[in-house]
Amino acid sequence: HMASDDTVCVISGESIAVEAALIAGEGTVIAVEYNGNDRRTMEENIEQFGLNNIAIIDHVDDESMKDLPVPSLAMLVASASMEQEIACLLRLNPHMEFVIYTLDFRCAAALPDLFAKLGIGETDVIQITVSRMNAKHNFEAEPAPWLITGRGGV
């Protein structure tokens, strides 16, 4: 549910940040990228697409976020620092919407409890499966990510 004027925080998803900047062309995307190679790729894509609505930062904390617009939506790739990142984002906007991406079943199964602990409700957990037909007309399964969503303050 991203609008053209939304402020979105994307953590560890360089291609998602670029897509979000295209969709929220009148808004702002705060891109947090820890990996240097991914950050360079994102910077190249920002230049290639002529995007001027992305602010790149290297971590999430109160200090790095203080001069940026307050996001209404956060998209995160699950990581060891995810709980701290979510808690920080909730301090900025207690009603923030979250979308978490993971390929790890255990992580997906644990997220509803983490969301409840942090006061995030309306939790939904879905898995997307994709199969591709190969040259021998057999279907090959692709990685099947879990998407976990929720909203703070409900």
How would you label these PLM feature ranges?
Residues 56-99:
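Active-site segment flanking the S-adenosylmethionine/decSAM binding pocket
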Residues 14-26:
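Conserved SAM-binding loop of SAM-dependent methyltransferases across substrates and taxa
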Residues 90-144:
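C-terminal substrate-binding/active-site "lid" region of AdoMet-derived donor-dependent transferases
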Residues 13, 33-38, 78, 103:
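Short beta->alpha hinge that forms the Motif I/post-I loop of the SAM-binding pocket
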Residues 32-73:
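S-adenosyl-L-methionine
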Residues 5-14:
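Conserved class I S-adenosyl-L-methionine
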